[in-house]
Every structure is written in C-alpha cells, then in structure tokens.
C-alpha cells in the first residue's frame, strides 16, 4: 500500500531575495515531488517572476486552502497568496517594510496550518531580519518567532547535514553575554530536546550526543573558566542519569576533526554558542545544510543560508539546501 505523501507548507521568504527562485528550482525536482505535496505561502507576482527568471515550465495556480492544493499535478505550483505586492515593491536586493510584513504573514499562516493539522510540516525560505524589524516585527529570527507562535518555551535551534548535526545552547546572543547564559538547566534542556528531536532521524533509537566545552581546553581545571565544572559537567551527568547517551565535555578546537569522520561517531553535537558550532557545520555542509527547530509541537525546517541578495533575480542560487529542508520535513512528518 502506498503511503500518502505529506503536504508541506513552504514559506516564500523575502520577496526581494532568492527565496522564490530556490523554491521554483526545488519544486522542479521530481525527487521532491515524489516526497511531498507542496503548498507555497507567498506572493503571486514574486513567484511568477521567479518562474520567468528560472525559465521554468511549471504553472502557478492560486488556491484558497491546503485541501484545494492536495490533488494538483506535479506540473503545478500551488500558491496560497498572502500578499499582493506590486512589481515596484519587489526590488531585488533591497529589504523593505512591505517585504518584512509580508514575510511575517507567510510564517504566521504556515504555523497556524501546522498547528491545526491542515498541513504536515513547514519548510521556510530565507528572510531578512532587517526587513521584519522595519515592519515592526522584532524577532531575532524564525526560531524565536515560531516559538512564540507555538507558545513553546523549550526549543532548540539545530543545523544539520548528512554528517554533522549541531544544536545550540544559546542562539543569537552577543558573545560577551554567553557565559552568563550557560547554566546546568539550560544545557540539560538542550541535551534533552536534542535527543528527543534527533531520535526520528536515527530510526528512533537513543541518539549519541556529544557536548562541547565553552572554554579552551575545557577550562583547564578552572584556569580558563569555570563553566564546565559549574554547569556543563553537571548537566551531562544529569542527562546520563536519565538514560541518555551523552558524552563530554569536549574541547571544541579538536572535536570536529573527529566528528566529521564517517561513519559519524555522534548523532548530534551540543555547542554552547552560535559560531562555536556553526563555523565547522558550515565548512562541512555549506550547500546542503538545513535548520531544524526542535521542541516545537510542529515540524519546521529551513534553509541554512540567507537571502543572498547579490544573487536575487539571476536564477543562479543553489536550491540544494531548500531541497534538503523539504525532504527532511517530509521525512519527519512520516514519523508522526
């Protein structure tokens, strides 16, 4: 018996960036069409212009609901139109208040559709935080906005590729603020949410989690900082007592040399701050990495790159990350 394909809400991202183009490219791939039923949430003019830029034979059809899009053929891109921007409003490479407000509406509606069960998951194209801020929507990024929309306090941002998966204890924080945010409770929460979120990607076995130190050489017995002894090691010990397969803390300067070996020794890595974990992740998975928000009551994946304003309108932006985010969203949806 054939398993029904999950319907995935795909938010268009910033109309002035590469989002519309990478969505067109992704939905032109038969492998993506075989994995899911797509529903794009966005703007008709922006998507139509992307079809032209990409020289795509796909047809854009406006629908009023996910149900209306469910049985459309693969030659069609179903669009739930949530903004009506004029061509003059879509200025490639230039974020604006109008585009920022439109982006917010796409994300909000996709989250609502996921929460009501009208779609199985959502995959998001890149946004401009500057544009959203201009429009009065003051969020550090997708992750924090979705956590608020889902009324979720325990969420984790994880970036992932085929070899590395890296979850963050702190996300968009100034480096000077990070040490004060490293607590036993925060590290333990991140370990728990990561283990639970990664399990479906590991055949639902207990995932192997590695935890990084904050300081050089794991603090060198307190010479370079006490966060390891005060917070990180107690969190690891508590997680182990709960039956989780957790190891560490590991010194970040050498850890990733071994972590990228295949087969990977760990299913996920918990890093203390943004650049500690994401520099090595992006060195290994710059093109194919994705973002997964763990801990939400919904499934949300995203590309692991920005709006690429310098490429907008050229039709040359890589859709590899967009394809991967849709594919993983569909895979996770199949486990629920």
UniProtKB/Swiss-Prot annotation:
**Cofactor(s) annotated in UniProt:** Zn(2+); Mg(2+); Co(2+)
EC number(s) per entry: 1.1.1.262
The UniProt function text for this chain reads:
Catalyzes the NAD(P)-dependent oxidation of 4-(phosphooxy)-L-threonine (HTP) into 2-amino-3-oxo-4-(phosphooxy)butyric acid which spontaneously decarboxylates to form 3-amino-2-oxopropyl phosphate (AHAP).
List where in the cell it is found. Cytoplasm
Task: Provide the reaction this enzyme catalyses.
Answer: 4-(phosphooxy)-L-threonine + NAD(+) = 3-amino-2-oxopropyl phosphate + CO2 + NADH
| Name of the protein | 4-hydroxythreonine-4-phosphate dehydrogenase
Keyword Transport in record: no
Residues binding substrate: 142-143, 282, 291, 300
Q: How does it assemble?
A: Homodimer.
């Amino acid at each position: 018996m054939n398993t029904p394909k999950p319907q995935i809400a795909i938010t268009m991202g910033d109309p002035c960036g590469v989002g519309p183009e990478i969505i067109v490219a992704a939905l032109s791939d038969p492998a993506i069409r075989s994995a899911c039923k797509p529903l794009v949430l966005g703007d008709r003019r922006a998507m139509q212009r992307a079809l032209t830029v990409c020289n795509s034979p796909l047809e854009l059809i406006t629908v009023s609901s996910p149900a209306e899009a469910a049985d459309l053929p693969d030659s069609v891109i179903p669009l739930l139109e949530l903004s009506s921007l004029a061509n003059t409003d879509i200025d490639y490479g230039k974020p604006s208040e109008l585009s920022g407000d439109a982006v917010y509406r796409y994300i909000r509606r996709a989250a609502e559709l996921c929460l009501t069960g009208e779609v199985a998951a959502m995959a998001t194209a890149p946004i401009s935080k500057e544009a959203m801020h201009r429009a009065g929507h003051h969020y550090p990024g997708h992750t924090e906005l979705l956590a608020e929309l889902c009324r979720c306090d325990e969420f984790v941002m994880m970036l992932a590729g085929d070899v590395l998966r890296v979850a963050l204890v702190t996300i968009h924080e100034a480096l000077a603020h990070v040490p004060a945010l490293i607590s036993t409770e925060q590290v333990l929460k991140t370990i728990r949410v990561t283990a639970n979120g990664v399990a479906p990607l590991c055949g639902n076995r207990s995932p192997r989690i590695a935890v990084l130190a904050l300081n050089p050489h794991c603090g060198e017995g307190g010479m370079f900082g006490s966060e390891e002894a005060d917070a990180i090691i107690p969190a690891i010990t508590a997680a182990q007592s709960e039956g989780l397969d957790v190891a560490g803390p590991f010194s970040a300067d050498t850890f990733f040399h071994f972590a990228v070996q295949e087969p990977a020794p760990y299913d996920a890595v918990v890093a203390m701050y943004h650049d500690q974990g994401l520099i090595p992740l992006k060195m290994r998975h710059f093109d194919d990495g994705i973002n997964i928000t763990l801990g939400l009551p919904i499934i949300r994946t995203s590309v692991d790159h920005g709006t690429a304003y310098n490429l907008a309108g050229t039709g040359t932006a890589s859709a590899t990350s967009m394809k991967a985010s849709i594919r993983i969203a569909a895979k996770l949806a199949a486990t629920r």
